[in-house]
Amino acid sequence: MQNNKDNYLKFTKMDKKSIRAPYDQNDLSKKIQRIKKREDIFLLYKINNIITEHTLLQPKQRILIAVSGGQDSICLLRILFDLQRKWSWKLGIIHCDHRWNSRSKIQAEHVACLAINLQINYHEGIAIESVQKESIARLWRYNVIQSVAISNNYTAIITGHNASDRIETLLYNLMRGSGLHGLQSIKWKRNLCFSHFTRSVLSKIKFSFLVKKLKFIKTFMDHEDFQGNHFFFLKKRKQLHLIRPFLETTRTEIRNILTIWNFPSWPDVSNKELRIRRNRIRHRVIPYIRIHYNPNIDQTLVRWAEIVQSETFYLEQLTNYILFKIEIKKKISSISLKIPLEQLRKQKEPSEEKLNFYQSAIPVDLLRSLPVAIQRRVLKQYIYINTNRILGFQYIEQIRLSCLFSLQDSLRKFLHRHRCRPIYLSEHISTHSMKSSTSDTCIDWKGPKEKKKLVTPWLIFPGGIKFLIRKNYLFIFSPKNSSLTIKRPRIEQ
């Protein structure tokens, strides 16, 4: 019996060894390859679902891909190339050479070789002079991409911004003190903001003017030589969108996919320079938080940015709806006040006849009935519509307090809260606060001595923007023209 047990144990040991040997060499490698293939397919499936869920792209669309040569843009190019058969896209590649170093030319040749191998149209923009500042280089890069997209009839521009870039932008804006609009960081899809030349010159060329000058304008648009490149029409410019489908994919996932594909990429040397703030956030702040506070900080911040973006979109739509209702109630399309600026400056209290021209003003009673967050957004959007300028939080809060309380109370409360120097002045008063935290607000009166009340019709802000609170209405004056103009709010669909 003992011999039988020993033989059985020997047999089982030999049998296990015989089973393990081929499994360690062949089956394990096949299993690893299977996992890699699944990870590859999973990323394609993920990007395809993101495009469908957020309606980023449409079938048979002309797409321009911004490829810098780094791992993000190279991975994006490969994924869109694999999805091209399903969606029937017409792809194009654009590369911008900033001439920051001597290797930029080799990097451009590397991207051009990829375009040739994939048989995709290639466009390249080269800077005449090397730009050292990142902000100026970014503006130049976007202007080049927009001009190429408009002239070649592309309807979408895709960049390789990923979840890691979104987290870095969120933390950077948080340290700067941005609001919800800055905390949502990078959006999935947005309309491109065109250059000053496009907004000021090209938008003035209207179709009706061309019909009068060119009787053959209808055949001119459909001519084969132009191939639909009507870059001067506003309809074409409104169709151009900037899309980022990688906002849920981290930089480590992209790096792993490129190692699986064995696809060449060109790393950006400037990403390692710690003198740049974003690089310090990338290499020092985020790893420190990941080690000492939350190892899953990337997923947490991405989820937070998505929540902030959806709630910000709701608040923006609600604000536009309120402004639209104010406009419908007043039945105003566009009104101009034909009174010279000098006459308005001389008057301390405008007459009721002149105030009737300000029919698109915001009712103060309506503003008081809204929540505080909506009050600030309505004021900020209303000011931007009429003056094309964005005021900071302290100025918006100042106007809001002036609407809710009397001018004197709001002035004292605001200066006592912020302990700051004068922010708004008038023709008769100037205000300032003392350095001591316990002292009261000091008010210097420069007007006639017999008047003791702190009453002035105008609130003057930086840039010459003036506000008037009169008859329970808030009126606005923009210094661009010599007369008061009121524009119709632009409601986004």
From Swiss-Prot:
GO biological process, one term: tRNA modification
GO cellular component terms, A-Z: chloroplast
CDD domains assigned: TilS_N
Keyword terms: ATP-binding, Chloroplast, Ligase, Nucleotide-binding, Plastid, tRNA processing
Location (main, coarse): plastid
The protein's role, per its UniProt record: Ligates lysine onto the cytidine present at position 34 of the AUA codon-specific tRNA(Ile) that contains the anticodon CAU, in an ATP-dependent manner. Cytidine is converted to lysidine, thus changing the amino acid specificity of the tRNA from methionine to isoleucine.
Free-text domain note: The N-terminal region contains the highly conserved SGGXDS motif, predicted to be a P-loop motif involved in ATP binding.
Name recorded for this polypeptide: tRNA(Ile)-lysidine synthase, chloroplastic
